[in-house]
A protein has these predicted regions:
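Acidic active-site catalytic centers that drive phospho-/nucleotidyl reactions
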Residues: 7-9, 23, 75
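Generic N-terminal amphipathic, Lys/Arg-enriched alpha-helix
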Residues: 7-17
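Hydrophobic aliphatic residue packing
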Residues: 14, 26-27, 76-77
Length: 102
C-alpha cells in the first residue's frame, strides 16, 4: 500500500476554501487520494424535504474485520475577519510545531 504523509495531506486539505455549503473540490480530491490508496469509494447524496442535498464520501478498504469507522466533515464555517488571523486561513503554515489553517 502507498504510504501517506499525514502533515502534507492535512496541508493539502486546508488549501481548499470549502466553506459551507461549497466543497470547492475537496471531496473529489479526497476521493481520488483514497482510491489511489486502494479504497473503494462512492459519493452518496442525502436529501430530504427540509434540507438542501448533502454529498457524503463513503470509502471502504477491504472487507474483513475488525472494522474501523471514521466520520468527519470536509467543510468549514467562514473564517470571519481575515485581519484577525496571523496567517491566511487557507494557506497552511507550521509554526512552533503546530499546523495553523482553517
Amino acid at each position: 500500500m502507498q504510504k501517506i504523509n499525514e502533515l502534507e495531506l492535512a496541508k493539502e486539505l486546508i488549501r481548499f476554501p470549502s466553506i459551507t455549503p461549497i466543497d470547492a473540490g475537496v471531496m473529489s480530491f479526497l476521493e481520488k487520494k483514497l482510491t489511489k490508496l486502494g479504497f473503494k469509494t462512492k459519493i452518496i447524496t442525502f436529501k430530504d424535504k427540509t434540507h438542501k442535498p448533502v454529498k457524503n464520501l463513503y470509502a471502504r478498504l477491504g472487507n474483513k474485520g475488525p472494522n474501523f469507522c471514521y466520520a468527519g466533515h470536509l467543510d468549514v464555517v467562514p473564517p470571519g475577519n481575515l485581519n484577525d488571523w496571523t496567517v491566511n486561513p487557507f494557506k497552511p503554515k507550521v509554526k512552533n510545531g503546530h499546523l495553523i489553517g482553517r
